[in-house]
């Protein structure tokens, strides 16, 4: 493919820019110390997509075993059993690469590996073990995960969403600023009710009040205030994985009556009502703590994750800065209606470039044209490992370079404006939103 001179010139500039990520699920250092190509794939989007059965976090005995818990699908990743016959293993790997090597997740993960480990060509059965060995050797250095993010990924900073341990900064507070997740508080009104990550506040915090709803809310408020005082920079909801993101107004009395009802005492409809109250309560807390509220939209429970379902909440809380994640994919054009009409909407293209690179290019073209301000567009990798994060950065930089080059060539703006916009998209917008001093 012949690349235009404009693309090559803008790409050279973009490739050297640092990034700030709005969203990571980066796994602890101890996990990375045992990393291989197989465990990397297991804890990646292609692993989720392929669907190897994984251990749930609540059943683990230590954080070095943390793995992404998702529903199993039909196809499995190649076996990582060292006792497997070499011929069988080679065949499994070849079939895996043939079946999934064209998927955007795999393409960008592989480009991340190439950038870090310097091998030429593509991953294949013949070089699988040697690349895996390189990964293992690199990660014997306990500093490797952050070194890779900073060196190959050009990361300045990242917002960390440790859904297995709310508010956790991975013991790297200078690099990771945590989110304050709301999911289990929205979903669980009793220890018999768990959110999609198998969490409940009544399990995570054994001393949490259960006899009085006011005391319960006070406990949560103090918990979030403490997180905020210790470096948390945003609130985060991924409840779209289990319910609609249309949150109706519910009065306090109704929610109080539903509080601490067990699974066999409460209907699904009443669980939604309770969650509606709690989510609205958190919107008020977000305003009080003066932090943005990150909202998962798209690609979850598809019937309930369309970004337009969230409009009433956006309108209800004009003082809350809502960060709409994932471009609302696959409804990335529809999210523009919200960005056009509401100045408290920040479009975050987190995850989108590795879901569909072509879709992300189309989306960014439109966002630049329609967003109320060029300051209201951002990005995050949304990955578990440094290797996949680097791939996600490369995908984002490709998308930005391609869009800016096409805008320049179309006469939409000139090269100097493109350079300014590139800096905003790479790090300045996120730095301003989360108040990082860069």
Regions found by a protein language model. Give the residues of each.
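Catalytic pocket-lining loop regions of alpha/beta-barrel enzymes
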Residues: 244, 258-380, 387-389, 429
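Short, solvent-exposed loop/turn segments at secondary-structure junctions
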Residues: 26-28, 163-166, 183-187, 239-244, ...
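Histidine-centered catalytic micro-motifs
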Residues: 19-29, 293-300
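Mid-to-C-terminal alpha-helical segments outside catalytic/metal-binding sites
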Residues: 2-22, 29, 34-35, 41-116, ...
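Active-site gating/metal-coordination segments in enzymes
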Residues: 2, 116, 121-292
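Non-membrane alpha-helical structural segments and their capping/turn regions in soluble enzymes
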Residues: 210, 214-217, 225, 272-276, ...
